[in-house]
Structures are given as structure tokens and as C-alpha cells.
Design a protein with these regions (language model features):
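Extracellular/lumenal inter-transmembrane loop segments of multi-pass membrane transporters
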Residues: 119-130, 159-174
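C-terminal or late-domain output modules
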Residues: 147, 168-181
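Extracellular/periplasmic catalytic domains that process cell-envelope and extracellular macromolecules
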Residues: 29-32, 132-135, 174-178
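Amphipathic alpha-helical interaction motifs in eukaryotic regulatory proteins
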Residues: 110-117, 155-159
Length: 329
């Protein structure tokens, strides 16, 4: 929903003079040039869910996505303002009930597209008026941020499924989902490379801001390239995946532990680069600049939930998904 309401969708949420929310068309939405399908994934993100659980959330004291901070449904305390305390319905919050690897998420997305394009053939780009056959569905996949990693993996899986369909490994009745374009927006492509780039940018950029000194830069890059550092562990992780978990099912504990260690090491490798008092997305600006999140309040209105047929409130961030991925990266 971030992409739909804050970035490229056909409309955006605005606050009216009376404090209510409504939508208005986005002038440069991507729907000007294409049909767009936004997918909430992995399970328990956005409007996707496994089970429906009724809970109460205090947004002041709790981390709402955390399973440990959920409370049984209860009345709002008298000293707590209405905006801060909400009763709602959410996914289970269980890490065992979501995809814990990008390869598994790729499979889930392929099966979703199979179901969606079959159930709604008029949205299938492979359906042509006056024809009885369905041509290959030529789609354009765009992914952002971590999409720099999952986008290529999704693309590879779609093509592998097409090959399996051709050689008879899977039924011919499966739709051929042909990838026309893979687009990556502000993508995270490679952790060691990103860590080095962040440190270099923090030390030397065209805006004249410098928030790491030469010693921090040199120590950071040396640590990244050292034995047992970010780069070394990332390479060990890749080698272990290739030999012990080539299908990406996440069922080799030694590989999971090694890759989790690599992730943690790389996350902290360039940490000095992110200790900056300005916006990480636009270092000219203080504080953080970006589209507002009013769409969350809009989507969580009872009338909107009823209109779109969602049994759960929207969840912009899922602790269950993050914990599952961190445990088996």
C-alpha cells in the first residue's frame, strides 16, 4: 500500500478541512500508462493475513506489530485519548505462518498470479478479444528497497516455471507468466557494496556534508573487507546456500545461522554512515521528508474496510515477517 498511496498509484489520500480523509487522483500515477496490481506480501503485511485475531493496541506504549505487545480486546482507558488506543483485527503475528525466505515468497507470488489471472481473465494481458486461446502473460515487475534483492529472485522463478511448463514438469494448464521488464527502485542489491558506498558517501558527497571522518571511513571499509567481516561472511553465506540449500527452502540450520550472522555483521558494518541528523533520502532536508502516512488512517476506517471487503486492519510493518527473515536469511 506504500507504493499505491505514497508513490505510483492512481490516487492519494488527502485530509479535508473538517479533519476527515478522502482520495484524489494522482496526476502522474503509473496507471496513465499501464494496468497496475499492487501485491501485499509476504503474508501478514498490508491487508494479507493468515488468521484473524482481535486485539487492542496502545500506540503510545506498545510496538503494535509485536506479538508480545498485543492485548485482548478491551475498553479504552479513561485517561487515554481516542486516537492512541484502538481495537482492531490483525493477522496472527506468528513467524511460522509467513514466508521466511525470498525464494518461498517468489513461489507464493507466482501462485497468486496464477489464481488472480485465472479468476479475473479480463485483467490478463494475454487474453485477446475474439480469441479462445490465452497468450503468454507479459508482465512488468517493479520492486523497491529490498526489491533489489527479491525482484531478480522473483523474475528467475517465473522464468524457471515457464521452463518447467514447457518440459512437462508442471501442467500446461498453468499460465505462462512472461516477464517483460524488471524494474528496481532505490534497490538494495548487495550488502557489502551498500555498506562501502554508504561510508564513502558519508565522507565525500557533492552537498558538502561530512558526518564520518577519515578514520571512521578507513576503519569501516577495513572491517568490511577483513576476514570474518561483512564481505567474507556474505560470500560464505552464498557458497553455503549454493551447496546446502540450492532450492532456497531454508531448511539447513547451519546455512541459516551463517547467513543470519552475515546479515547482522553487514547491517552494522556501515552503521556510522547512518548516524546523521538529516534525512537519509534527501540530505539537504531536516527532518525526514516524505509523503505522509495518512493513508493508514484512511484505510483503517470501518467504512473503507467494509467497502474493500477486508476482514483485517492494514499493517504497514510486520514484526513476524522481519523476525522470520532474520532467522533464516
Amino acid at each position: 500500500m506504500v507504493g499505491l498511496f505514497q508513490e505510483t498509484g492512481p490516487c492519494k489520500v488527502v485530509q479535508n478541512s473538517d479533519g476527515t480523509y478522502s482520495t484524489q487522483p494522482r496526476v502522474w500515477g503509473w496507471d496513465r500508462s499501464s494496468n497496475i496490481l499492487f501485491i501485499d506480501q509476504p503474508t501478514q503485511v498490508g491487508f494479507s493475513y493468515d488468521e484473524c485475531v482481535n486485539v487492542s493496541v496502545d500506540f503510545e506504549n506498545d510496538n503494535p506489530p509485536s506479538l508480545a505487545n498485543r492485548r485482548p480486546p478491551s475498553a479504552r482507558p479513561a485517561d487515554v485519548p481516542d486516537w492512541r488506543f484502538k481495537n482492531g483485527t490483525f493477522a496472527s503475528g506468528l513467524t511460522s505462518n509467513t514466508e521466511d525466505l525470498t525464494e518461498i515468497a517468489a513461489r507464493a507470488s507466482w501462485h497468486f498470479l496464477q489464481g488472480f489471472l485465472s479468476a479475473f481473465p479480463h485483467y490478463n494481458p494475454g487474453v485477446r478479444p475474439g480469441r479462445t486461446s490465452v497468450e503468454p502473460s507479459d508482465i512488468n515487475l517493479f520492486a523497491e528497497s529490498y526489491g533489489g534483492t527479491y525482484g531478480p529472485i522473483f523474475a528467475d522463478f517465473y522464468e524457471e516455471q515457464n521452463d518447467r511448463r514447457k518440459n512437462g514438469t508442471i501442467p500446461k494448464s498453468a499460465l505462462e507468466i512472461r516477464l517483460g521488464t524488471l524494474g528496481i527502485v532505490n534497490g538494495m542489491l548487495d550488502l557489502p557494496t551498500a555498506a562501502v558506498a554508504a561510508l564513502n558517501y558519508a565522507y565525500n558527497n557533492t552537498y558538502g556534508y561530512h558526518w564520518v571522518d577519515l578514520t571512521q571511513l578507513q576503519n569501516g571499509i577495513s572491517g568490511i573487507n577483513a576476514e570474518g567481516g561483512c564481505k567474507d561472511l556474505a560470500n560464505q553465506c552464498r557458497a553455503s546456500v549454493a551447496s546446502s540449500d540450492p532450492e532456497g527452502f531454508g531448511n539447513d540450520e547451519a546455512t541459516n545461522n551463517l547467513c543470519a550472522r552475515a546479515l547482522l555483521t553487514c547491517t552494522y558494518a556501515g552503521i556510522d554512515a547512518y548516524h546523521f541528523p538529516k534525512s537519509l533520502y534527501d540530505i539537504r532536508v531536516t527532518p525526514e521528508a516524505g509523503p505522509g502516512a495518512s493513508y493508514l488512517e484512511y484505510l483503517n476506517q470501518a467504512k473503507v474496510l467494509q467497502a474493500i471487503g477486508s476482514p483485517v486492519n492494514i499493517t504497514s510493518y510486520s514484526a513476524a515477517v522481519q523476525d522470520a527473515y532474520n532467522a533464516s536469511t
